[in-house]
Amino acid sequence: MIEAGRILDIPVVISEQYPKGLGQTSNQIINIPLNPIVLEKTTFSLLKTEEIYNAIKAQGKKQIILFGIETHICVLQTALDLIKEGYEVYLIKNASKSRKESEHEAGINHMQSEGIKILTLEIALFELLKSSTHPHFKEIQNLIK
């Protein structure tokens, strides 16, 4: 999804949950030539870290595509806070994960019950493209092959 963001000129904000203790985001992600904004946090919800919330607001978007690690904790709390702030939230189910599958599914079910739209990566990408005549159709298609 991050590479698709680069291709489609979609802003990307990456958070790292306590990288000193849990490790940093992979260089494969950070070094994508999109220059994503990478910010550290210790809160579970992105919106509870002022610097990250300000970075999200600065993008001027009302639709947020969300994915990440610990679906049932960080992703869930972020999604719920985004909804409260008036954002339209789309979770990429197959780009998110929890250590336990049961927690992942419970987090997804809870988000869905709160109005978060649950998509797969492929569904999201083709909804963004709308048509095979989109100028970046081939590039996006190659990402999912």
Regions found by a protein language model. Give the residues of each.
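Active-site-adjacent betaalpha module
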Residues: 4-8, 20-145
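Short beta-strand segments at enzyme active-site cores
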Residues: 11-17
